[in-house]
Amino acid sequence: MNNISFKLFITISIVLIIIRLFFISNTILIDDEAYYAMYAKHLDWGYIDHGPVVAFLIKIFSYPFLTSFNVRIGAVICSIILAISLFFFGKKYFNTETGISLSLLLSANLLFHTNSTILTPD
């Protein structure tokens, strides 16, 4: 693998992250996200239909202001962590090109892109 393809990989990844950030800053919360944001205001170890992880993520990233961007930024950060993890997994067990392919195939997938900007466990 040459340096140019790695720079292209980084550039494409950054562009996809910027698109996600633009998307979450220009859309309103869906009903479930508003429901989980209410959970974040009243944290508990469990709720009637879900565990506390989504509420904890929203609480962490929405301090001190509870906005739609802050509610969804946790989903974007988790998707970035997943893409980086896939890159290192592919690099460790196969080669660098496989790591790049895994990460880009995940990040560029339209269904993943849409679902990685909505913070719900469903």
Regions from the PLM with identified roles:
Residues 53, 85-86, 101:
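Hydrophobic/aromatic residues in alpha-helical transmembrane segments
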